[in-house]
Amino acid sequence: MTELKRDAKGQWLVLVAAFLGWMFDGLEMGIFPLVARPALQEMMPAIGGTSPDQFVGLWMGRITALFLVGAAFGGLSFGWLGDRLGRVRAMMLSVLTYSVFTGLCYFAKEPWHLGALRFVAAFGMGGEWSLGVALVMEAWPEGKRPLLAGVIGAAANVGFALIAVLGLFFKVTQDSWRWVMVAGAAPAALALMIQLFVPESERWKESAKRGVARPVKEVFGAGLLKNTLLAIAFASIALIGTWGSVQWLPLWADKLTGGTMPQAKAVTQILSGVGAVVGCMLGGLFGGGIGRRPAYFGLCLMSLILCAVLFRGVHEYGGMFLVMVFLVGGVTAAFYGWFPLYLPELFPTRVRATGQGVSYNAGRILAAAGALTQGQLVVFYGSYAKAGAVVTLIYALGMGLIWLAPETKGKPLPE
């Protein structure tokens, strides 16, 4: 009985640590869209910009791209570290990295300073996802995985919504944005909790006893190459859709209101975040219910339709805009409840953190190209909506690719 209680306590500690780690990731991701406009406008004279909209759009795209590339390299590096040294120690270091370097954004004087610091912060964020997912999926029984996948996926969007609520009550200006970044250093305390209280994965311990893994080589080896490349493609499609369009919704809201409604950005971000929490919870259950492949196909189809309605059919800030923001935020985020369920099922324990990290975060590199493209499209079209309408066509590709992947519903995690 004592052993069972200890196991249950360990499972809950793992879940809480992974949830908080990914929630704070979402908070860190939500910070920049909230502060981007005042921060970049403050820095514009140092660079010599003349058009605020074009300057903000261009640098928003560049900094978002750097963020995504940093997350990709972080996912690879910390995933490798998690397979070699253990999930817990690697996750502690990842949380510490993103907390400290978010806080250091306080000292940025030029846009490239922000870009460099966001790159390193993202390095830590990219690692936390793959490590947290591996820990949870290895600690809990198979029957709980669809629900827990949704819970973990929703965590980032809880953080995203929380930072938006802050923006609703605390006006972010050219004088105050730096203090928002300082608040982003708070998750450093979580790193200490992880190191002191969270138990290491028993599956990883058993796998480590069997010999030294070569995780990077193996995930790109003949046995796993197809799974790895398909997982990268699936992550890329979802991430391009999110970072190339949905992340720009607060800026679009600000543009639609002409800057006369300071709360418009925060309300947009809150509704998108709340929709995303619901979507993530349902995404894992959706995949667990009808199967991994039909679920991904359905999410791509719904995302394609709803994004088309939002970006092509809505032309002013109001009730219709806010309803569509909620729906688009939900369906495009449901992928992030599906990924924690499906990606662990594609890789054995000895390389699971690396495989997930490579797949999900290599997708971020391609999403970085999407963010850069979005920035250029905003300049070209002079419209966030037209740019978003083009980028979100990427979901059509996912509707075909998913049928090349294995169906894993009802199968245990590979050892």
Predicted regions and their residues:
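Glycine-rich segments within core transmembrane alpha-helices of 12-TM secondary carriers
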Residues: K144-V172, P187, Y360-A371
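Cytoplasmic membrane-interface "Motif A"-like loop-to-helix N-cap segments
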Residues: R84-V95, G288-C300
